[in-house]
Amino acid sequence: MFDKLFEPIQIRGMELRNRVVMSAMGTHESAESEDGKSVTDKLIAYHVARAKGGNGLNTVEVTSVDAPSAPFGFLSIAEDKYIAGFKKLNDAVHEAGGKTCIQLWQGGLAVASDQMAQILVPNDLPLSPQY
């Protein structure tokens, strides 16, 4: 009944070993990094374990695309300095037989938990006092 689930699939030239896809889950492991926004060895181990367990594709958690609004404890790819960490994660998951993708994110009001992050929203209406 679920034979197709475990068959390889090609998506625009990339082959996944099966159709098991892990959706993005917030681990907040980046909070343990020096700047609070980088890939950590613990995050890499988390994704490698899931690839070894059989996932064809792991979606890495929300990843900020804008430096001023990247809150502490969330991954960022807003600056080139983050590329090496993502490459290390990607290479490790490939070595374990899986693939990765990331969920790009501009946090909007969700970044309000970090007083240092700039809140960006798509309008010029005043924010409520809680923000």
Segment roles from a protein language model:
Residues 20-23, 58-60, 100-104:
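Hydrophobic faces of well-ordered beta-strands that scaffold small-molecule active sites
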Residues 33, 59-83, 104-116:
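Glycine-rich, proline-tolerant flexible connector loops at the mouths of alpha/beta enzymes
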Residues 11, 20-39:
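N-terminal binding-site loop/beta-alpha segment at the start of enzyme catalytic domains
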Residues 31-49, 75-95, 113-115:
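Glycine-rich anion/phosphate-binding loops
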Residues 42-66:
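Catalytic domains of carbohydrate-active enzymes, especially glycoside hydrolases
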Residues 22, 50, 54, 93, ...:
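Conserved, mostly hydrophobic/aromatic
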Residues 1-24, 93:
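N-terminal amphipathic alpha-helix/helix-capping segment at the start of soluble metabolic enzymes
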Residues 94, 99, 105-131:
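Non-globular sequence segments
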